[in-house]
Amino acid sequence: MSSNAQVKTPLPPAPAPKKESNFLIDFLMGGVSAAVAKTAASPIERVKLLIQNQDEMLKQGTLDRKYAGILDCFKRTATQEGVISFWRGNTANVIRYFPTQALNFAFKDKIKAMFGFKKEEGYAKWFAGNLASGGAAGALSLLFVYSLDYARTRLAADSKSSKKGGARQFNGLIDVYKKTLKSDGVAGLYRGFLPSVVGIVVYRGLYFGMYDSLKPLLLTGSLEGSFLASFLLGWVVTTGASTCSYPLDTVRRRMMMTSGQAVKYDGAFDCLRKIVAAEGVGSLFKGCGANILRGVAGAGVISMYDQLQMILFGKKFK
């Protein structure tokens, strides 16, 4: 071998892609996915909120008469406000996704370390940890994004009523914040916060409780590993959990509707008691049918969008 020959130093391996950049791509694409799903389901979401809050709207004089059902609400809203009004409040709903996901990413490891038990350590311990972690994560996220959910609710339930000459109460997202802060302060933006957190815990408890109970009974034999069977079970469990926890959603939204009003509820229990006394238990479930339809529409859109992502990018973004 010649002394003049140079020994080539092997090149260092190319640096692995940064996790931060991977997170950013997933974060942005997940945002697009959420925006598509929420925007597609916005009409049924607004109908759900109008039906759910109609008794509060009647008391406030922002609705002239009750809705006879989902179709009647669709028809009257389209006639009185135009088709584009079905997307009223959707901007706040879409914006909500980004801080929620960022917070979940930032704190999920810490919360998991605090409450993340394995099923092998005991089902009761795992189940309690799951509820605690869900409640902690939900409360933390809600603390930052609850005002957007409040604004979305107020915009969606702000109808053009003949009682007030067709005038709306709010002229957009910023106007909701300005008027609420002026009349009620910061507390007005967080009315209904406590039942929202309780609702998250109740929903998660029902979801995991039903799923773990039904899965070993139904997903057996030829159905084990079946995507369709798993999807249907997930939909049934989600629908059941959301229906059972729906009264808490009604209570929190009815509390939201009182910000800016002279008469308010003295907390979640007072709200629940007065609704049942004046309107009956059935009033707590108004809009529940539309809520179930929204779940079907959202799942369908997400499934189609996931397939599109697989074709274009070879992966799904969440």
Swiss-Prot record:
Domain of life of the native organism: Eukaryota
Regulation: The matrix-open state (m-state) is inhibited by the membrane-permeable bongkrekic acid (BKA). The cytoplasmic-open state (c-state) is inhibited by the membrane-impermeable toxic inhibitor carboxyatractyloside (CATR).
Principal location listed in the UniProt entry: mitochondrion
Pfam families reported in the protein's UniProt record: Mito_carr
Reactions it catalyzes: ADP(in) + ATP(out) = ADP(out) + ATP(in)
Sequence segments annotated as region (Important for transport activity): 252-257
BP GO annotations: ADP transport; aerobic respiration; anaerobic respiration; apoptotic process; ATP transport; heme transport; mitochondrial ADP transmembrane transport; mitochondrial ATP transmembrane transport
Membrane topology of this protein: Multi-pass membrane protein
Entry keywords, A to Z: Antiport, Membrane, Mitochondrion, Mitochondrion inner membrane, Repeat, Transmembrane, Transmembrane helix, Transport
Subunit structure, as described in the record: Monomer.
Family per record: Belongs to the mitochondrial carrier (TC 2.A.29) family.
Protein's name in the database: ADP,ATP carrier protein 2
Gene source species: Saccharomyces cerevisiae (strain ATCC 204508 / S288c)
Source lineage: Eukaryota, Fungi, Dikarya, Ascomycota, Saccharomycotina
